[in-house]
């Protein structure tokens, strides 16, 4: 699902809100989440999951085009850990 599809679906389900209001709310929520992670804080949405930063240590990588070794610096990357309720709902899906 894309952000546009999410906005469309929520606007349809919440008839009292316009698509522009839903879009504004989604954009603000995502901006606040990004700002929170950027400051190094953790985000927890009970039942859904938590977002945090994990540190990736420096390592030697490889340039796929040339095959030569490249030294990669350590960095923080976003990490999502699903909550119990979300895991149970996904586990119940029969693919």
Swiss-Prot record:
InterPro entries in alphabetical order? Hist_DNA-bd (IPR000119), Histone-like_DNA-bd_CS (IPR020816), IHF-like_DNA-bd_dom_sf (IPR010992), IHF_beta (IPR005685)
Concerning SUPFAM superfamilies, the annotation shows: IHF-like DNA-binding proteins (SSF47729)
Any keyword Secreted? no
The record's section on PROSITE patterns has: HISTONE_LIKE
Query: Could you state a single Gene Ontology molecular function term?
Result: DNA binding
User: Pfam families, per this entry?
Assistant: Bac_DNA_binding
- Keywords, sorted A to Z: DNA recombination, DNA-binding, Transcription, Transcription regulation, Translation regulation
Any one GO BP annotation for this protein: regulation of DNA-templated transcription
Please provide, in alphabetical order, the Gene Ontology terms of the cellular component aspect for this entry. Answer: chromosome; cytosol
Q: Is Transcription found in the keyword set?
A: yes
Q: Which family does it belong to?
A: Belongs to the bacterial histone-like protein family.
Subunit = Heterodimer of an alpha and a beta chain.
Under NCBIfam families, the record lists: hip (TIGR00988), PRK00199.1 (NF001222)
HAMAP family registered for this protein in UniProt: IHF_beta
The record describes the protein's role as: This protein is one of the two subunits of integration host factor, a specific DNA-binding protein that functions in genetic recombination as well as in transcriptional and translational control.
State the name under which the record lists this protein: Integration host factor subunit beta
What organism is the protein native to?
Answer: Shewanella sp. (strain W3-18-1)
């Amino acid at each position: 699902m894309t952000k546009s599809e999410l906005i469309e679906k929520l606007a349809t389900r919440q008839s009292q809100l316009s698509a522009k209001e839903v879009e504004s709310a989604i954009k603000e929520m995502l901006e606040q989440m990004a700002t929170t992670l950027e400051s190094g804080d953790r985000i927890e949405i009970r039942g859904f999951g938590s977002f945090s930063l994990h540190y990736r240590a420096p390592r030697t990588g490889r340039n796929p085009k040339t095959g030569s070794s490249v030294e990669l610096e350590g960095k923080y990357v976003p990490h999502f850990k699903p909550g119990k309720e979300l895991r149970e709902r996904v586990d119940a899906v029969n693919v």
